Amino acid sequence: MSTPFKMERGVKYRDAAKTSIIPVKNIDPNQELLKKPEWMKIKLPASSAKIESIKNGMRRHGLHSVCEEASCPNLHECFNHGTATFMILGAICTRRCPFCDVAHGKPLPPDPEEPQKLAETIQDMKLKYVVITSVDRDDLPDRGAGHFSECVKAVRELNPNIKIEILVPDFRGRVTQALEKLKDNPPDVFNHNLENVPRLYKEIRPGADYEWSLKLLREFKEMFPNIPTKSGLMVGLGETNEEILQVMQDLRDNGVTMLTLGQYLQPSRHHLPVARYVPPTEFDIFRDKANEMGFEHAACGPFVRSSYHADLQASGGLVK
């Protein structure tokens, strides 16, 4: 009889060590992968001085960016523009979603000094718009909502003119309690990603629930009707276009006015494979449909991610 796998606290488990313990076994690391089309090939910028400056600034304050931890394909572009999405509550997630490159494991307790460190780093970077996200923290009674609130408070106190977008987890089973924690320090934009279609949730988002996520977006909007809510989806995981359109309609029915839609990319052979590459023309169709549904801002394109050019999208600019 094999010995049960035991995780050590504070250790990052990635790739096979992470996805091998997912109940739904649907990943074959030896299968042939789809070839990337030309439109999915990125030309990296020549200069990396700005990139290293941002990385060093985060290391200096002991902070993390989701750009690095999730291996975002837009890292070079965003860092070269002096923007980044900060990831609070550590870099170890209590979930093990097989599309995501963020490490799984038993996280360390939240750093009580992180809100102040975050505020000072943002001040040093002279940011006017910031996105703050986090790993899932199912180990915490409030799922990390109180820490989010403290971070928003600290950032505003030191940067009074800044616009803050928070990209939150689903606060598993604690939606009402989490929103109570957030109400004293609300953001300028509230973002929570549905990621994909409900039919594929068991494979793509183990531990999550489609209706929970809609409830979170709906209840925040009811609490703060004047603050825009936002959500993001990935395509290329086996869903149909009709299913994506239905999710978009569900978002509108629950008060969401900002949408991001991008191509899923496989972080490693131990993650879910890409089922198809969606051409740019189809993303244009999705954007047109989103506009017809009443989304005020819809960023749709192969490289769009939930916080990609978030400042531009929030101000009404075209992102694709």
UniProtKB/Swiss-Prot annotation:
Binds 2 [4Fe-4S] clusters per subunit. One cluster is coordinated with 3 cysteines and an exchangeable S-adenosyl-L-methionine. It is found in: Cytoplasm. Keywords: 4Fe-4S, Cytoplasm, Iron, Iron-sulfur, Metal-binding, S-adenosyl-L-methionine, Transferase. [4Fe-4S] cluster 2 binds at residues 93, 97, 100. [4Fe-4S] cluster 1 binds at residues 67, 72, 78, 307. It catalyses: [[Fe-S] cluster scaffold protein carrying a second [4Fe-4S](2+) cluster] + N(6)-octanoyl-L-lysyl-[protein] + 2 oxidized [2Fe-2S]-[ferredoxin] + 2 S-adenosyl-L-methionine + 4 H(+) = [[Fe-S] cluster scaffold protein] + N(6)-[(R)-dihydrolipoyl]-L-lysyl-[protein] + 4 Fe(3+) + 2 hydrogen sulfide + 2 5'-deoxyadenosine + 2 L-methionine + 2 reduced [2Fe-2S]-[ferredoxin]. It holds the Pfam family Radical_SAM. Its cofactor is [4Fe-4S] cluster. Its EC number is 2.8.1.8. Residues 79-296 form the Radical SAM core domain. Pathway: Protein modification; protein lipoylation via endogenous pathway; protein N(6)-(lipoyl)lysine from octanoyl-[acyl-carrier-protein]: step 2/2. CDD domains: Radical_SAM. One of its GO terms (cellular component) is cytoplasm. GO terms for molecular function: 4 iron, 4 sulfur cluster binding; lipoate synthase activity; metal ion binding. NCBIfam families: lipA (TIGR00510), PRK05481.1 (NF004019), PRK12928.1 (NF009544). PANTHER family: LIPOYL SYNTHASE, LIPOYL SYNTHASE, MITOCHONDRIAL. Belongs to the radical SAM superfamily. Lipoyl synthase family. This is Lipoyl synthase. It comes from Haemophilus influenzae (strain PittGG).
